[in-house]
Design a protein with these regions (language model features):
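Conserved N-terminal glycine-rich FAD pyrophosphate-binding loop of Rossmann-like flavoproteins
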Residues: 1, 67, 121
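Rossmann-like NAD(P)(H) cofactor-binding subdomain of soluble oxidoreductases
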Residues: 35-105
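Conserved N-terminal Rossmann-fold NAD(P) cofactor-binding segment
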Residues: 1-26, 32-41, 85-91
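Internal alpha-helical scaffold of NAD(P)-dependent oxidoreductase catalytic cores
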Residues: 83-102, 106-196
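Glycine-rich, N-terminal phosphate-binding loop of Rossmann-like dinucleotide-binding domains
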Residues: 29-32, 70, 125-126
Length: 196
C-alpha cells in the first residue's frame, strides 16, 4: 500500500484501459503463467495480454519496447509471443517495436525490495537500437547492478535455472537441518549463514 501511495503521488497511473499503451515507450508484461493440472505451463494470460498489445500497436505511431517479465519456457518468445505481436500489430519486431525478455527474480516475501534492489538484470533479445535503449534505462535506474545481455532463449532458461537452483538450495538446507537435529550442538542457522 505504501509503495502504491508513493507511486500515485508521482503520477503513476493505474488503469485497465489498454488503449493507453499506444503512447508508451516501454510496456512491461508481467502476468501469471501458472501450471496446468498436467504440469504444462498455462500461457493463456500472456497470450491474451500480447494479443491486446498487438491490436493497440496496430493503431500506434510509436515504436515501443515490450519487455516480458513473466516466466515462460525457452522458445516462448520466438514461437508464441513474437508471432502474435507481429500478426496482431501488422508490424515487425526489431524494426517497428522491440521485444525483450526481462525475467524477474522476486521472492514473495521481498518483492518490493527485490524490485528496487535487484541483484542482476537479464535482458534477452536481438542487439538492436531497442536493446541499447533498455540497457541505458536500467543502467540509469540501477547504476551498480550487472546487466546480462543474451538471447531470448537463454534469458528464458536463466529464469527456470534460477528457480530450480533456489528449490535445490531449500531442499538441501532442509536435509542439513534434519542431520543437525541428530548431532548435539550442531546449529543449522550458523551453517545456513555460511553456505548462503
Amino acid at each position: 500500500e505504501k509503495t502504491l501511495r508513493i507511486g500515485l503521488k508521482k503520477k503513476l497511473t493505474i488503469s485497465n484501459d489498454f488503449s493507453l499503451i499506444k503512447d508508451c515507450n516501454m510496456i512491461f508484461v508481467a502476468v501469471g503463467t501458472p501450471q496446468k493440472s498436467n504440469g504444462a505451463i498455462d500461457l493463456s494470460m500472456i497470450r491474451k495480454a500480447v494479443e491486446t498489445i498487438g491490436r493497440v500497436l496496430a493503431k500506434s505511431k510509436k515504436n515501443p519496447i515490450i519487455l516480458i517479465k513473466s516466466t515462460v519456457i525457452p522458445g516462448t518468445m520466438q514461437n508464441v509471443i513474437l508471432p502474435i505481436l507481429e500478426k496482431r500489430s501488422g508490424k515487425k519486431a526489431g524494426k517497428d517495436f522491440g521485444l525483450i525478455s526481462n525475467p524477474e527474480f522476486l521472492q514473495e516475501s521481498s518483492a518490493i525490495r527485490d524490485t528496487k534492489f535487484p541483484h542482476v538484470i537479464v535482458l534477452g533479445g536481438y542487439q538492436t537500437k531497442f536493446m541499447k535503449k533498455v540497457k541505458s534505462f536500467f543502467s540509469k535506474l540501477h547504476p551498480n547492478v550487472s546487466i546480462i545481455i543474451t538471447n531470448h532463449q537463454t534469458a528464458e532458461m536463466i529464469k527456470y535455472a534460477n528457480n530450480s537452483f533456489l528449490a535445490t538450495k531449500i531442499s538441501f538446507i532442509n536435509q542439513l537441518s534434519n542431520i543437525c537435529q541428530n548431532i548435539p550442538g550442531a546449529n543449522i542457522d550458523d551453517i545456513a549463514k555460511i553456505i548462503g
